[in-house]
């Protein structure tokens, strides 16, 4: 490891006392510390260095901080290298970042934005006069002191302009704030300090609208749009809310041609920044941020249909009255099942939260430095070589910065006009070959991180048993449920490790702690009608509201909010609390844009690339969104304006080797007979949709009811009374039984480890995947059964046959050791 210049080798612990962790910078964690020499507070970034690490970026940050002394740039105190840990010590800004502040207060007022722009421009003017570029201006990198000063921070990706290198040629920054010439650097040949002016203009919009333009798009799609010659600079959405001075200031700062874009010095002379702007504007903002009751309500919540009158808690009838066992419940304990089979196209396990708590929530002592070192070793916080793509994994900067990436892979492009819109019915398109079959999106941008998760068997909930053949059975978890349930999933809390059943119903979203079945209580989580649920990385997706948008809910946050509400009784109804005091961008439930009127959706993972997609079928279009790990959310990747042949019909994503995007199966058919081929009707998303694809009418003989991709080359196709097992071309498989036959009309099929479980209105039957022999069977003419969920765990509902309006019983297939 090369030696760093201007770095002391003395022990930094002799001067600085660490107090608490406050965030993460570009390459390391940041701590609040006390300077024992001056008794003042300081910010200390600690980075673990390993042999062979590229330290050029760290050296750049130290050099820029040391050389740039200005009131609007965080002051540099010193750097220390001790035991392979680099300490960069800077001025502490107690007000936090502007991103943190607007999350608490909502949008800034125009004069507050003007004040921030003026102070930031002063810092940029000084930086540019020294021949340096910041390259990562955004709300998260503008810090405030408690006195209302604005400081430029985080110079981890900054660059220096020299006489020999008049323009930077590296692709660096944060996508949504990136200037067009930076997005197209490989084609246009470079950029200069004016990219910071563009980023400040985007930041001004961010402060007024709580997010930068194009934020609903996947970052790579946003970059692709910005690099096009037809790209138009963004504007404020609400023209009437803001003054003409603000609009004109943004027009200048966001001038597309950098040769015509004004400098920071020139913009300091604009009327928007020369108006009377006292420091009190920012101190008032800080006061507001410290008082959450001054937050603004979320207008999105007004669109949700709520059930205020339905109880917050529902007790199982087993506690408060006799619970008679039905014939099927007796059979449930006699018939054993194999574990549910994990589909290769299911998203990976939820990554458990890293065991790294915010220091300061606990009593601090002399062992803090030891805990810092242990945590650094546990996290393996290292700097990769410059040739590697830097993964966006900072938990505190929710607008991830690209560090250094000489090559990001090809951007998604629009399909050429001459490309065929669909494949002939019957086969999935062949995988591409040749040099043009490179990945659409780099996996570092989009994939969920594969971490070594503890086994789900260690969770607190329904007890697992060893992995034995046929060791599971259905267990009743709730008796007499009054909810009109549409969907259900299971989820494990990342902190308590308790397992929960989450149900989506007409009356809202409720949870049941499977670790506390002696309580037998369903608790309301969200008071909005819900027709579909899916859980990804502790984010609960739901189809909710009067006009059925897709919503994303932060499950750990909602559970914590409910816990606090139960501790401190409020007069405000629990479902209205977020509308009263939590700003829109800080809400625990957020609406995914452009999904109004969604009829159905599916989640699928490409096992070849690791990318996870969300398909949303709307009445007149189909949306394809991709999971973006740094933001823990789905972002729009493509919008197909052509309507599906039947938006409410079959919608099953299929993943093919060599294809980045999933194929959408909208129908399947096949003549009777175990050796017959199944014909798939697929829409290849790379090419777009075709409006006149031939789909067999629903209900006719030979049309499939359900299609399930079990692994990379195996598909289950469910017909009225049989299940075919075929490969991706629709041909019967050679190793498994080509057809499983049933003597009842199939409603739902679920694939177990060695059998297929088919459900019908009065029971279920399992048949071996190898021999077609019956492996399990339960029949109860007195009950009507319905599968509520089959992702990870099978959740079943039953109601009396003679009284369909009666309360239902809920069951979960348990006793197996989950394969997830």
Swiss-Prot record:
Residues 344-360 are annotated as: PEST2. Residues 482-793 form the CNH domain. It catalyses: L-seryl-[protein] + ATP = O-phospho-L-seryl-[protein] + ADP + H(+); L-threonyl-[protein] + ATP = O-phospho-L-threonyl-[protein] + ADP + H(+). It is a peripheral membrane protein. Its EC number is 2.7.11.1. Belongs to the protein kinase superfamily. STE Ser/Thr protein kinase family. STE20 subfamily. This is Mitogen-activated protein kinase kinase kinase kinase 2. It comes from Homo sapiens.
């Amino acid at each position: 490891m090369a030696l760093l210049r201007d770095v002391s080798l003395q022990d930094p612990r002799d001067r600085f006392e660490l107090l608490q962790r406050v965030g993460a910078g570009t390459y390391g964690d940041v701590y609040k510390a006390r300077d024992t020499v001056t008794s003042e507070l300081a910010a200390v970034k600690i980075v673990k260095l390993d042999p062979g690490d590229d330290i050029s970026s760290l050296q750049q940050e130290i050099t820029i901080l040391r050389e740039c002394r200005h009131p609007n740039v965080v002051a540099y105190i010193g750097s220390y290298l001790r035991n392979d840990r680099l300490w960069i010590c800077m001025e502490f800004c107690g007000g936090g970042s502007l991103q943190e502040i607007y999350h608490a207060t909502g949008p800034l007022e125009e004069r507050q934005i003007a004040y921030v722009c003026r102070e930031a421009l002063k810092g940029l003017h000084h930086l540019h006069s020294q021949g340096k570029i910041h390259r990562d201006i955004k709300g998260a990198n503008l810090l405030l002191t408690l006195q209302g000063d604005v400081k430029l921070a985080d110079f981890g990706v900054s660059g220096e302009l020299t006489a020999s290198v008049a323009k930077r040629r590296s692709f660096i920054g944060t996508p949504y704030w990136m200037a067009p010439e930076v997005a197209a650097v490989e084609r246009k040949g470079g950029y200069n300090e004016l990219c910071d002016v563009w980023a400040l203009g985007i930041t001004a919009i961010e402060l007024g609208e709580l997010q930068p333009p194009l934020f609903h798009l996947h970052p790579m799609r946003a970059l692709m749009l910005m690099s096009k010659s037809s790209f138009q600079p963004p504007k404020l959405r609400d023209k009437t809310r803001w003054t003409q001075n603000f609009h004109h200031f943004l027009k200048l700062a966001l001038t597309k041609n950098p040769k015509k874009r004004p400098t920071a010095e020139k913009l300091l002379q604009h009327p928007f920044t020369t108006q009377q702007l006292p420091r009190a504007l920012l101190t008032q903002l800080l006061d507001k941020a410290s008082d959450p009751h001054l937050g603004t309500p979320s207008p999105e919540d007004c669109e949700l249909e709520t059930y205020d009158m339905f109880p917050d808690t529902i007790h199982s009838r087993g506690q408060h009255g006799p619970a008679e066992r039905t014939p099927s419940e007796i059979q449930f304990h006699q018939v054993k099942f194999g574990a549910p089979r994990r589909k290769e196209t299911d998203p990976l396990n939820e990554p458990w939260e890293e065991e790294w708590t915010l220091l300061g929530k606990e009593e601090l002592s002399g062992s803090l430095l030891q805990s810092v070192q242990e945590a650094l070793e546990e996290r393996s916080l290292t700097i990769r070589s410059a040739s590697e793509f830097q993964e966006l994994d900072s938990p505190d900067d929710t607008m991830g910065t690209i560090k250094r990436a000489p090559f990001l892979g090809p951007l998604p492009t629009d399909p050429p006009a001459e490309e065929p819109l669909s494949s002939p019915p019957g086969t999935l398109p062949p995988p591409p070959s040749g040099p043009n079959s490179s990945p659409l999106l780099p996996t570092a941008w989009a994939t969920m991180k594969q971490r070594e998760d503890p086994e789900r068997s260690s969770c607190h909930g329904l007890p697992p048993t060893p992995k034995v053949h046929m060791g599971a059975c259905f267990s009743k978890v709730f008796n007499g449920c009054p909810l009109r349930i549409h969907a259900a999933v299971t989820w494990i809390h990342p902190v308590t490790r308790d397992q929960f059943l989450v149900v989506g119903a007409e009356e809202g979203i409720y949870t049941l702690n499977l670790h506390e079945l002696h309580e037998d209580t369903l608790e309301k989580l969200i008071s909005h009608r819900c027709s579909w649920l899916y859980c990804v990385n502790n984010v609960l997706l739901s189809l909710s509201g009067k006009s059925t948008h897709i919503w994303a809910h932060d499950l750990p946050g909602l559970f914590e909010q409910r816990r606090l509400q139960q501790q401190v009784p409020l007069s405000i109804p629990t479902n209205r609390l977020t509308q009263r005091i939590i700003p829109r961008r800080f809400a625990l439930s957020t609406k995914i844009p452009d999904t109004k009127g969604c009829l159905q959706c599916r989640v699928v993972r490409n096992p070849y690339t690791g990318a996870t997609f969300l398909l949303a079928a709307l009445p007149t279009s189909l949306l394809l969104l991709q999971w973006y790990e740094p933001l823990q959310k789905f972002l729009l990747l493509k919008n197909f304006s052509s309507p599906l042949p039947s938006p409410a019909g079959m919608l099953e994503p299929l993943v093919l080797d060599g294809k980045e995007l999933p194929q959408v199966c909208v129908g399947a058919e096949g003549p009777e007979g175990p050796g017959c081929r199944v014909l798939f009707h697929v829409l290849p998303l790379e090419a777009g949709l075709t409006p006149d694809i031939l789909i067999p009418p629903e209900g006719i003989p030979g049309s499939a009811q359900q299609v399930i991709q079990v692994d990379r080359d195996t598909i289950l196709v469910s017909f009225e009374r049989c299940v075919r097992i075929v490969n991706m071309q629709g041909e019967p498989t050679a190793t498994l039984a080509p057809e499983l036959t049933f003597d009842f009309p199939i409603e739902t099929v679920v694939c177990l480890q060695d059998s297929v479980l088919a459900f019908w209105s009065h029971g279920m039957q399992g048949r071996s995947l190898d021999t077609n022999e019956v492996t399990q069977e339960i029949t109860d003419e007195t009950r009507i059964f319905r599968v509520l969920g089959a992702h990870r765990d099978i959740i079943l509902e039953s109601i009396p046959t003679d009284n369909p309006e009666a309360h239902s019983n809920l069951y979960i297939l348990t006793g197996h050791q989950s394969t997830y």
